[in-house]
């Protein structure tokens, strides 16, 4: 199967050669597995698509279903192979750049020489970057396919001499054969435990290599510029929503949460055991030649008394090797911890570990003793790497966030308050301000609100039960296992206080006794809440009881910003602008109350859901909003794109850590004058208002819901079994309001319209230009990181959008009376392209990124046939449904294969 690269020239001849090599091997697989006729048809379709799209569409329209399915699979497999090859070469290019210019952390450290030394030390002390893995249904590729692609990546990454090429090509061909013979469609919808295994797959790999490399380099580069990374600082940790995100997912029960935590710990402890076994191999230091601290020897004696499992023979063999013997005791405690969790027995101090802190304490005894007995090189090298890696993952691998909808808390509390009968209002009828005061008063109270068990119906008991599960988890697994409780659709301080009251009822906090085991996190996810962000935080922190809770959590308040829903309801321009402004306002309120703000960015994979290059996005944050800490969601196909190839995993983690460090240490004051910032803010208000109006006109068109369903395959999303979470909110019917942001983006992306990633931007920019502010636009693009980053992401999405293909969807699938919606989309697209090019100065989109521009052009030769087939199959399916013909399983299967194929070709689903 030849490559479309043959028709082009790119800057990377090696990349072209590798894609051609895999394309040829795929062609051999097709002949070997299906016969030469399939390969001939693939080449004919690809050639015809390039020469005459309509002729290609006509040919595919009459293709038999079985052949159509094979065609789609051939093109999709090509994309999987091309994607993994590009990932390998991206990693290779980054390594070449590292060799020539030094690593990104080294370059960042050089910039830090200009930072205020005291502020830099404080930033480094607080440094914590936390990618949070979520299970949102956007990863279309099955793990079975991803495993094989990872093996292909490993083969491509290995330098091969000519004498070995035949053997490596055989290994590649074997894996391509296996990909072809693997069903890429899920037979059943995954359970949360299956989703957890997917995330754990990547976390295990990161544990084994990339994270240790990043932390070791970070420590060394900071030391080079005179900054010590404190021993107790965790610059990199990981989070997860899998098993903890209950909002709209009835499959996440307290029992499921527990099962996922057990699964994470099984892997986390096994990963820790591998590192400890490695240490035992190194730590042969004899007490005859080195000595050891009294503290280490005392702890070793205590361990040996408490751990009779360690055989006398082993004690005798290692009697003069206290470091190795201590590592053996650590290993036994880890084994005991694993057994305790499996059996559900109680923690035995000194025999097993309750949380990561006890493990790290034991390891630091070894490290300190080595430092004091001429073992500093190993103590500050391999030993430090091991300790920091274990601190990054903990025994839990990733700290779980728990999330629930604000209404669920109020529903439970309504039953408890109404039962008391002390208020003149029914709880559900209370105005928000009144309810907030009632809950704040209750938070101050010493008495419990309800007896135990609380008199609640099934739904209320389930909500309170989650808090009890969190309490139990902290008691069994340790304090790092769950740290944040997130309230989705948070609209006011009362929503935060409600969760805090339920946490108190479950024994998770006691303001009078002075402890709080979890933090409460508001999630602001619509435009209205983003605009009110400062008011909401002010109302929270001005209440003495809640301020006390924050103090007990280290004077840190986490706030999550939702990109997906704000974009769906307000359009991308208003969403991005209001999130940017909300961060400024939140920063000012937090500073006023002496609180450190931790922002949690709920980004999706696509630009329409807040996606885009992480490094640029972090550097574009407002000044002072990063104080060394950031949390960012990693969703769906973004996880495999960033972490499937080990070299890329390292670079992506390095990018995020470096950007956070740089922005926190150096961006402590405005880069612009107050006058310039005021001018740009006013300009962005004009852009946002006009863009919002254009977007709302589109989504409020009464014909849009029917048009959206007609012109996209969004109804097929549920059949793909991408995730455990339903694509619609409960009881939402067929309205767009009830459709989650992910399928909203999914549908537009599949039909190549990608409306959420750009619609309204042209109207906004035009409004500013017509106001005579062309020069301000140019100034913003040249000098304002936020605006330049925003426009760059929009330009990339416009380049992925293909209204020529979209028109084929509309002409074939959409009734005539709805086609005016597409006319609106076409007009706004033309306007947006024109306005963006006026600012960038290019003749075509991505003129400043010729390699990316060419990559998109190359992919179209393979992507367009899949889109043509998708349209033809959708037409067949809908015609059959209209004629009451029984569903054809082969037709449904072929259609779902096209959905996977487009996702692979665009490297995005939702």
Swiss-Prot record:
Q: Name one GO biological process term.
A: tricarboxylic acid cycle
Q: Which residues form the active site?
A: 136, 568
Q: Which UniProt keywords apply?
A: Carbon dioxide fixation, Lyase, Magnesium
Q: Matching SUPFAM superfamilies, A to Z?
A: Phosphoenolpyruvate/pyruvate domain
Q: What's one GO-annotated cellular component? A: cytosol
Under catalytic activity, the entry for this protein gives: oxaloacetate + phosphate = phosphoenolpyruvate + hydrogencarbonate
**Which superkingdom is the protein from?**
Bacteria
Q: What is its EC number?
A: 4.1.1.31
Q: Which InterPro entries does the annotation name? A: PEP_COase, PEP_COase_bac/pln-type, PEP_COase_Lys_AS, PEPCASE_His_AS, Pyrv/PenolPyrv_kinase-like_dom
- Enumerate the GO terms in the molecular function aspect: magnesium ion binding; phosphoenolpyruvate carboxylase activity
Q: Kindly list the cofactors needed.
A: Mg(2+)
Q: According to its UniProt entry, what is the function of this protein?
A: Forms oxaloacetate, a four-carbon dicarboxylic acid source for the tricarboxylic acid cycle.
Sorted alphabetically, which NCBIfam families does this protein's record hold?
PRK00009.1
Q: Indicate the family of this protein.
A: Belongs to the PEPCase type 1 family.
What is this protein identified as?
Phosphoenolpyruvate carboxylase
According to its UniProt entry, this protein's organism is: Streptomyces avermitilis (strain ATCC 31267 / DSM 46492 / JCM 5070 / NBRC 14893 / NCIMB 12804 / NRRL 8165 / MA-4680)
């Amino acid at each position: 199967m030849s490559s479309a690269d043959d028709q082009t020239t790119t800057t990377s001849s090696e990349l072209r050669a590798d894609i051609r090599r895999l394309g040829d091997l795929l062609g051999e697989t097709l002949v070997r597995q299906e016969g030469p006729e399939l390969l001939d048809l693939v080449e004919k379709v690809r050639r015809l698509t390039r020469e005459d799209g309509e002729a290609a569409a006509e040919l595919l329209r009459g293709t038999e279903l079985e052949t159509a399915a094979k065609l789609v699979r051939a093109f999709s497999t090509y994309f999987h192979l091309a994607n993994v090859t590009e990932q390998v070469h991206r990693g290779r290019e980054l390594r070449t750049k590292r060799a020539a210019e030094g690593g990104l952390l080294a370059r960042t450290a050089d910039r830090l020489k200009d930072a205020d030394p005291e502020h830099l030390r404080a930033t480094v002390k607080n440094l914590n970057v936390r990618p949070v893995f979520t299970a949102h249904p956007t990863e279309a590729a099955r793990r079975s396919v991803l495993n094989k692609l990872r093996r292909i990546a490993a083969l491509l990454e290995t330098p091969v001499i000519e004498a070995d090429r035949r053997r490596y090509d055989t290994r590649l061909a074997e894996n391509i054969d296996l990909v072809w013979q693997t069903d890429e469609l899920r037979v059943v919808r995954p359970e949360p435990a299956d989703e957890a295994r997917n995330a754990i797959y990547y976390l295990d790999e990161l544990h084994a290599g990339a994270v240790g490399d990043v932390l070791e380099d970070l420590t060394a580069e900071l030391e080079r510029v005179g900054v010590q990374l404190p021993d107790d600082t965790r610059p990199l940790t990981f989070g997860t929503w899998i098993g903890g995100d209950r909002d709209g997912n009835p499959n996440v029960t307290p029992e499921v949460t527990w099962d996922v935590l057990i699964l994470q710990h099984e892997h986390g402890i096994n990963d820790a055991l591998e590192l400890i076994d490695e240490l035992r191999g190194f730590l042969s230091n004899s007490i005859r030649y080195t000595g050891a601290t009294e503290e280490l020897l005392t702890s070793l004696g205590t361990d040996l008394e408490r751990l009779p499992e360690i055989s006398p023979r082993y004690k005798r063999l290692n009697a003069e090797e206290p470091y190795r013997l201590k590592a053996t005791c650590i290993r036994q405690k880890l084994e005991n911890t694993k057994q305790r969790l499996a059996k559900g027995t109680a923690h035995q101090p000194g025999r097993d570990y309750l949380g990561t802190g006890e493990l790290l304490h034991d390891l630091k005894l070894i490290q300190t003793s080595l430092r004091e007995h001429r073992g500093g090189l190993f103590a500050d090298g391999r030993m430090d790497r091991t300790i920091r890696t274990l601190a990054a993952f903990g025994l839990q691998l990733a700290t779980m966030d728990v999330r629930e909808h604000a209404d669920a808390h109020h529903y439970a509390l309504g039953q408890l308050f109404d039962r008391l009968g002390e208020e003149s209002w029914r709880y559900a009828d209370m105005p928000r301000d009144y309810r907030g005061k009632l809950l704040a008063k209750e938070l101050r109270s010493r008495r419990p609100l309800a007896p135990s068990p609380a008199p609640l119906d099934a739904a209320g008991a389930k909500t309170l039960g989650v808090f009890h599960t969190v309490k139990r988890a902290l008691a069994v697994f340790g304090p790092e296992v769950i740290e944040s409780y997130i309230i989705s659709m948070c609209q006011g301080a009362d929503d935060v206080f409600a969760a805090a009251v339920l946490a108190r009822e479950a024994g998770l906090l006691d303001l009078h006794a002075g402890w709080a085991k979890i933090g409460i996190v508001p999630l602001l996810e619509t435009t209205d809440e983003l605009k009110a962000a400062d008011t909401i935080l002010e109302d929270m922190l001005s209440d003495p009881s809640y301020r006390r809770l924050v103090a007990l959590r280290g004077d840190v308040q986490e706030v999550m910003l939702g990109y997906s829903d704000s974009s769906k309801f307000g359009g991308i321009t208003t969403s991005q602008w209001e999130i940017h402004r909300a961060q400024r306002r939140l920063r000012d309120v937090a500073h006023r109350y002496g609180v450190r703000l931790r922002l949690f960015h709920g980004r999706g994979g696509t630009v329409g859901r807040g996606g885009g290059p992480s490094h640029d996005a972090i550097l574009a944050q407002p000044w002072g909003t990063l104080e060394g800490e950031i949390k960012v969601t990693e969703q769906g196909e973004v996880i495999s794109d960033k972490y499937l190839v080990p070299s890329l995993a390292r670079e992506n983690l390095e990018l995020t850590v470096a950007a956070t460090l740089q922005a926190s240490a150096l961006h402590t004051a405005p880069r612009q004058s107050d006058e310039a910032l005021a001018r740009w803010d006013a300009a962005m208000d004009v852009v946002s208002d006009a863009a919002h109006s254009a977007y709302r006109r589109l989504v409020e068109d009464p014909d849009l819901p029917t048009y959206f369903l007609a012109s996209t395959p969004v109804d097929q999303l549920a059949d793909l079994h991408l995730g455990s979470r339903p694509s619609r909110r409960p009881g939402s019917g067929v309205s767009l309001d009830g459709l989650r942001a992910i399928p909203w983006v999914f549908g537009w992306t599949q039909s190549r319209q990608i409306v959420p990633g750009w619609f309204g931007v042209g109207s906004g920019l035009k409004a500013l230009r017509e106001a005579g502010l062309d020069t301000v636009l140019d100034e913003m693009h040249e000098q304002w990181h936020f605006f330049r980053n925003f426009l760059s992401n929009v330009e990339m999405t416009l380049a992925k959008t293909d209204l020529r293909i979209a028109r084929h969807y509309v002409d074939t699938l959409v009734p005539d009376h709805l086609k005016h919606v597409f006319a609106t989309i076409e007009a706004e697209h033309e306007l947006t392209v024109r306005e963006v090019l006026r600012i960038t100065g290019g003749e075509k989109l991505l003129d400043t990124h010729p390699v990316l521009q060419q990559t998109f052009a190359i992919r179209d030769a393979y992507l367009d046939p899949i889109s043509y087939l998708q349209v033809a199959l959708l037409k067949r399916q809908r015609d059959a449904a209209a004629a009451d013909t029984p569903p054809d399983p082969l037709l449904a299967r072929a259609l779902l294969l096209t959905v996977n194929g487009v996702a692979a070709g665009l490297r995005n689903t939702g």
